[in-house]
């Protein structure tokens, strides 16, 4: 907190009870960090436009054929997952065949790019004792197709996967999984290096790798991507639960 920010907080809390000041100071500092992270994300990813912990997709052009649970399509689109301290932005373009109920990809000829930005955690600020589970969402650019019996129309929404990732801060390792995008994606154990983890990934018969970074002043978040067949395929992010010591 800068001297100017400290003065701002003091002026706004002259009449605040002493018992409430610490709580308000914590909230004040958190908001300062969120504001700093928003600037680092870039002007395209404002928190007003992209609410926290929500997947948002925008299609520029598409053509598709759907037969029951099978979707074959050519789509140009972006998927954004915004959290307080990080943003995961995926761009996809090209042909793909997938199960529109499970999100499982049968064939993938898309060009893709997944970029992660935000307030990176300083390596010295990552906790050194205990363990914690990070939970959040993931995407692979597939869509869930549903039928509305009231309107008699088919509707689609971006398919959401779920991330669960455990960090053992004492051992400096992390591993986890992503469910809800076809077969479970296993994120095998990797070692914390600086403020990042990189290790192998597996989904059924497919093998690849993943990378993630820590975000927030105190490693409150992780955000990263999974690479299969040499290209960015899955984006993910998660927020930290309580550290168990």
Q: Where in the sequence are the language-model features?
A:
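Mature soluble binding/inhibitory domains
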Residues: 1-245
